[in-house]
Amino acid sequence: MKPLLLAAGLVLVALLLYAVVGHGLVNYDTLYALDWGRDLGHGRLPDYAVSVAPTPHPLATLIGLLLTPLSSRSRHGITGDGAAQAAVALAFLSLAVLGWVVFRLGQAWFNTPAGVLAAVIVLTRQPVLDFGARAYVDIPYVALVLGALLVETRRPRAGAPVLGLLAMAGLLRPEAWLFSGAYVVWLAWSPSHRADRGRLLGLVALAASAPLLWLAADLAVTGNPLHSLTGTRSTARVLGRVTGLQHVPATAPRRLGEILREPVLFGAAVGAILSLAWLHRRAWLGAVTGVLSLIAFSILATAGLSILGRYLLLPAAILAIFCGAGAFGWMLVPRGNRRRRRWRLAGAAVAVALVAFIPAQVHRISALRTTLAQQARIQTDLASLVRRGSIGAACQPIAVPNHRPVPLLALWLDVAPRDVISAQERTPTRGSYVTPANRQVADAYILDRRDPVKVVAGVPDGFAPAGGDASWRVFRSCGV
């Protein structure tokens, strides 16, 4: 009965989170996972060499493969919309699971009030809701790593169950490989594991499974086992992203602040300092995980990969748990101990700061809701043009101003992403050209403030108006 109640509770939380933000959209990377999964489902190798392709995450592509029946189904002139809706549903469920795991960890490490506060903090952070509503793989990745921590907290040196969860996480984000390696080294210090070499070798194999599977997937598709590394570095250069270890000291704290905001950082500092000083047996696992996650982040930056805020969601979740400890950890100190009173005063200061910033947090979530509604409306207008046939097989190829709409139109039109032309890569000479109706639509939907080029490509010569709506204009040149 408990699993059923838990499942029902998670679904309820997912629905509540959806109601809070109002909409769900599938981001660029996950749309490619759906396209590539459909390719595999139809017996074709995915095309990882398409311009500005995202990093192929094996587990995300596998889910895309499992969703092939939905991504291949056409309804009212749109193909694959069912797969996109399923991805959004899974994304909100992942958010709910993340909140539950954060609660359980806070409860296990400290107490129930700390766990509740930590979960509330995580599920009310605007960036967390944003990444969740857009179906980024980073949310389930963090949930899996924290799930492994929860298993280890309840069953110290659990071994295979922890490594199994980390292996799944390692097929979404390579940072999990470091956690698996560190965990195996820690297990090897145990006399029981050293005595049973066969078991230890099995655990080493499990820890190595994620990187080996990732390398094998890249090799099978591209012939280059390091494609994800080299391709991601190349894309980071093309998009002008910040990379390099030298940028980590300035960027990481700022990005953590953008995720959590000042009161939570203050509470996390209080909780980390006091719990490590006075409740170190409870706090050490979280502290070690937080440090390892920052080391992993630094390694990625050193390897030339982009320094993105969503790569810091794991340490942000750990800090949220320490913020819960900052507010309520004093309850674990024996009565009559002077430390209890000092911590309680510090906890009261944390609580006051959190409450004082509630209006600002509500405003941020409201702004996110408005942004998602605007982008959903623009995307609905684009879908309407596909349904009406204004964009489709009648006049191909389809071209767009930049790479942003490519994977979505490829999904909807049931074509390869390479068959949708980005005008930033090459100027189309025939077919259909789809462009935003105005600058507001361009800024809201296809332009990114981080991109080096923030200009919408003009309509190619020889293309004439052929339709449109409030958000988009279609131009055609269908001659041979």
Name each region found by the language model.
Residues 187-188, 257-287, 292-295:
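Hydrophobic, aromatic-rich transmembrane alpha-helices
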Residues 346-407, 412:
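Membrane-embedded, lumen/periplasm-facing catalytic core of multi-pass transferases
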Residues 8-13, 118, 122, 208, ...:
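Transmembrane alpha-helix segments characteristic
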Residues 197-271, 295, 352-367:
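Membrane-lumen/periplasm interface segments of specific transmembrane helices
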Residues 6-9, 164, 204-212, 267-271, ...:
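Signature aromatic-anchored transmembrane alpha helix within multi-pass, membrane-resident enzymes
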Residues 86-109:
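Transmembrane-helix motifs of polytopic, lipid-linked glycan transferases
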Residues 18-28, 43-70, 74-77, 396-399:
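Membrane-proximal lumenal/periplasmic loop motifs of glycosylation machinery
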Residues 28, 55, 87-94, 117-147, ...:
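Multi-pass, polyprenyl lipid-linked donor-dependent membrane glycosyltransferases
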